């Protein structure tokens, strides 16, 4: 434990030097052993909200309330700022099946596809279902459309740093914020622990070894299996994947990005049978849009937490 405390101090210092704060947690899904940095700090979730959205939609498909083959006409996103993907950048309407909207929303992180799903299952209903499954620290208040109405969309790309400077400077000690999407009282929110709990419930059905004393929240197996597939197909692999994916390990995840927020949550399954849930939610104190160093630092901190758990 003393060695772990020394490691945590070292990692906190590295995050401070890199201009990052955040909520980190890594958990061994067989033993329940975990190691983290401020894992209960509440932060806006950005695109991580697409995980509970997908799970709620998949459950409604299972119950027969929603037809996965139903064709939905989706208006073009017409977004021109850097970042958004898929239908969000379309110039013309498209007809897409609900099942395919789930792929676009979860694996491609397409906000317009997510909003089409939120039209079917509104935020309040998604949150109600999340609560019924026992996840008390995941809050769903709004659709993705509101995430495209931040200061970042009001500046030219050359002035993106001004939006980040506002994001950094306009918060309060209680995590209120002048930008509503960054205000924990108004935004979709969660913690690293809440997302690790969700990941553990999603992966529990495929953990084949003994789990002494471990119980997970019960999720319907069919939606959980499909969401694992969608996370395995995640196309955005620039953040934690370089430190977790290899020929001897598979990495399934979802990213989230908004202004100075950079998040990723996922599960790494090692060829030797070990399985770890990883959640990283961060805020940057550096007013810059492109920060590859921050992405690398997030991954390094998470990997070292995982490495320490593998030694236990």
Curated annotation (Swiss-Prot):
Residues spanning the membrane: none
Matches recorded under InterPro entries: Beta-lactam/transpept-like, Beta-lactam_cat, Beta-lactam_class-A
Signal peptide: none
Alphabetical UniProt keywords: Transcription, Transcription regulation
GO molecular function: beta-lactamase activity
GO biological process: beta-lactam antibiotic catabolic process; response to antibiotic
Name under which the protein is recorded: Beta-lactamase regulatory protein BlaB
Organism per entry: Streptomyces cacaoi
Lineage: Bacteria, Bacillati, Actinomycetota, Actinomycetes, Kitasatosporales
Gene name as annotated: blaB
